[in-house]
Amino acid sequence: MTVDYKNTLNLPETSFPMRGDLAKREPDMLKNWYEKNLYQKIRKASKGKKSFILHDGPPYANGNIHIGHAVNKILKDIIIKSKTALGFDSPYIPGWDCHGLPIELKVEGLVGKPNEKISAAEFRQKCREYASEQVEGQKKDFIRLGVLGDWDNPYLTMNFDTEANIIRTLGKVIENGHLYKGSKPVHWCLDCGSSLAEAEVEYEDKVSPSIYVRFPAESAVEIEAKFSAQGRGQGKLSAIIWTTTPWTMPSNRAIAVNADLEYNLVQLGDERVILAAELVESVAKAVGVEQVEILGSVKGADLELSRFHHPFYDFTVPVILGDHVTTDGGTGLVHTAPDHGLDDFIVGKQYDLPMAGLVSNDGKFISTTEFFAGKGVFEANPLVIEKLQEVGNLLKVEKIKHSYPHCWRHKTPIIFRATPQWFIGMETQGLRQQALGEIKQVRWIPDWGQARIEKMVENRPDWCISRQRTWGVPMTLFVHKETEELHPRTLELLEEVAKRVERAGIQAWWDLDEKELLGADAETYRKVPDTLDVWFDSGSTYSSVVANRLEFNGQDIDMYLEGSDQHRGWFMSSLMLSTATNSKAPYKQVLTHGFTVDGQGRKMSKSIGNIVTPQEVMDKFGGDILRLWVASTDYTGEMTVSDEILKRAADSYRRIRNTARFLLANLNGFDPKRDLVKPEEMISLDRWAVACALDAQNEIKDAYDNYQFHTVVQRLMRFCSVEMGSFYLDIIKDRQYTTKADSLARRSCQTALWHIAEALVRWMAPILSFTADEIWQHLPQTESARAEFVFTEEFYQGLFGLGEDEKLDDAYWQQLIKVRSEVNRVLEISRNNKEIGGGLEAEVTVYANDEYRALLAQLGNELRFVLITSKVDVKSLSEKPADLADSELEGIAVSVTRSNAEKCPRCWHYSDEIGVSPGHPTLCARCVENVVGNGEVRYFA
């Protein structure tokens, strides 16, 4: 009768499932986290530790979250959780940007425009309600990602206290002398009916008319004299400009040239024209004239204040000098309309050029505009061209495709338009230079972010912070009805208004009667009707939120983390406001991530049909797979996502999960309180495995600390698949399953597995949060009660390295790994040749040089357990048979033969010692010792 020895084996057993089934299990875990107040437990466990504050850049409260939102929130969550594990108190307060035009437009679509079907006050309330709904929808999706934070108490820019603090930030800007009112060209969206911030402008290709225009000389004789060209050439004499915005011609008030450039008077066909010398050839080619004659040359400075007739109005305009004039294109003479271009405005101020003021808020010419009254600016383009043709001053017209500014919301072309607005001056109180200095104090990740934002700050115009909108934080200022000067008690009045807003929200300002605060001054002062740019809202949260929430304990902000578009957005507005109010940057570190693209490197687009939504990914793969993809990807560049890439992430996940399951299954019956083996009593290979885990942990901690999450994943995978999976875990199966349950050989192994599991679960937690929680619930209890959640814990401190007196040190095991790899290679050849089945069917002879013979001899009979074969002989390399193939590892050669011994049914090893015990005639001697004796003794493996 055959005896079944299965019940004498220590077979692995765990309730930890093989399949993650994440999409199904994760929602239940989330429910448990929130029912048990996990976030508050983390705060309690971290209290008193050094703080690390990552301030959440608020997403806009409109629409569903997209894959870019998911990337952003997951990266933040990985940092927060890893900082907690590294010993920091790292609170996370999520936020939302709640004012502004997109919400206004949505609400207009639902209830109509303010002051038409609905009052402005009711409209604001509808906006508030709409934003609240959007916040709730986005919040559910962010929570589903496994992101931990104070979701019950987020910051909203429309919270009454935040609105009040935004107003207080405006007060500090004024107090420090950075605010002024001026009429200057700003980006103006015709659809918004409002000015736009730099960050709200996108550049897209647009087809525009390209025109060369004649400005006839007021005195041809005078111009001839300047060029020393009296009596030379023939025909009328004109200055030629080139523009792609014909609609700005009515506002032309000058022609700009560069003082240092050379200008030619040119015979161009039957007329004489002035052009930059470098551009004569290209202009002649553009207008179709083959032969030109240079009649004279002067420097641009010599043309200053010469006068030319406006092409179709009855006045003349001067030539002025400007450094912005180049020979990169056009004619080298620049049409100058101070209302419609920043360079034009700046140079115009130097020459006291008048502002034309011909275009109204709706983008139409005012009623007094000759020829074009009531016409929209883009509608006027063909009319201007027609008028130029009619008066004979159009030299050439064609179409050109070029990059042109568009509104980021409407995707429509915008214009530059001079309007009275409130500005933060970049030069007042040295703000620009101070901001540039502060940039150098910040750590930029990746480091090219520094040069990028420096260039933006160097070149940015004054910040127009006023908007003509309904749903926004009001500019709670009082100005003199005649002089437009701020009220002398402005700072005091701002604080009074802020207190009211704190109680009742921004509507308190609109409901305020001037007399309440101003008394008799109400006769001479009025309320400013403008609202603040939404970038002022979010840009001031370093103060309006962080400085005022108790969780942050008044600590400075360590990090801002957003997409790379925020160099000109939130990073910029925050830097400007913090420098203006606090004379320092609001952050110590700024980390930026790239945009998500599809598998072919294309942007996500409805029209292409390549959009990957986080909701779909979580429904199909689960949140942990999405998190693993984010962590695995180098966020410093474009982040490629596709179904195929997510499947690869799922494969990596399975390898990690299988490792964790192996650890848990083999900890079956292990009680650390009772069974833990001291390091010095552990078997050599087990000590080495724990030391490997320590090395991995040090590298992983360092990678987390430097935000190198793809390095964390790579190191985690190498540990699970290579160091553990293909070496250590493979070797210990025999010892784990076949030795006596309570033997040192087995308990030493379980001790190592327990230490490794305790470390591994913590390494995983910031990235694979759901799976780490699941593993944590399956780990054996320790002497002190295990914390309820892994997320309150720091990285494991129970790992230990190898002692200096360790004979079998890491270098030893690394050499042995090389030998084992070579043996496996030869075994694989034998398997493929059908000479053996598994490695245990083989008897291996290793022919080794003196160095390797000494190395292998140290393991004695236990070498076979490391090589996972039934028998190993080690011989001198000099005994190698002549016909034995060379090894790929210099210094050894390997031969494999099929064992003729019997197979032990319990351990599956082939042995000559089967049947030595009459009571167990089918077992090998080793198994008899493990079943009925004191158990085999292991020293090394």
Curated annotation (Swiss-Prot):
Residues reported to bind ATP: 606
Gene3D superfamilies for the chain: 1.10.730.20, HUPs (3.40.50.620), Valyl/Leucyl/Isoleucyl-tRNA synthetase, editing domain (3.90.740.10)
Keywords from the UniProt entry: Aminoacyl-tRNA synthetase, ATP-binding, Cytoplasm, Ligase, Metal-binding, Nucleotide-binding, Protein biosynthesis, Zinc
InterPro entries found in the cross-reference section: aa-tRNA-synth_I_CS, aa-tRNA-synth_Ia, Anticodon_Ile_BEm, Ile-tRNA-ligase, Ile-tRNA-ligase_type1, Ile-tRNA_ligase, M/V/L/I-tRNA-synth_anticd-bd, Rossmann-like_a/b/a_fold
Protein's cellular compartments: Cytoplasm
A Pfam family it matches: Anticodon_1
Residue ranges of the motif 'HIGH' region: 59-69
Motif annotated as 'KMSKS' region, chain positions: 603-607
Residues annotated to bind Zn(2+): 904, 907, 924, 927
Cofactor or coenzyme needed: Zn(2+)
Gene Ontology biological-process annotations: isoleucyl-tRNA aminoacylation
Catalytic activity from the UniProt record: tRNA(Ile) + L-isoleucine + ATP = L-isoleucyl-tRNA(Ile) + AMP + diphosphate
GO molecular function, a single term: tRNA binding
Main location: cytoplasm
UniProt binding sites for L-isoleucyl-5'-AMP: 562
E.C. designation(s): 6.1.1.5
CDD domains (alphabetical): Anticodon_Ia_Ile_BEm, IleRS_core
SUPFAM superfamilies, per the entry: Anticodon-binding domain of a subclass of class I aminoacyl-tRNA synthetases, Nucleotidylyl transferase, ValRS/IleRS/LeuRS editing domain
Biological role: Catalyzes the attachment of isoleucine to tRNA(Ile). As IleRS can inadvertently accommodate and process structurally similar amino acids such as valine, to avoid such errors it has two additional distinct tRNA(Ile)-dependent editing activities. One activity is designated as 'pretransfer' editing and involves the hydrolysis of activated Val-AMP. The other activity is designated 'posttransfer' editing and involves deacylation of mischarged Val-tRNA(Ile).
Free-text domain note: IleRS has two distinct active sites: one for aminoacylation and one for editing. The misactivated valine is translocated from the active site to the editing site, which sterically excludes the correctly activated isoleucine. The single editing site contains two valyl binding pockets, one specific for each substrate (Val-AMP or Val-tRNA(Ile)).
Subunit structure: Monomer.
Family according to the record: Belongs to the class-I aminoacyl-tRNA synthetase family. IleS type 1 subfamily.
HAMAP family xref list: Ile_tRNA_synth_type1
Name of the molecule in the record: Isoleucine--tRNA ligase
Gene this chain is encoded by: ileS
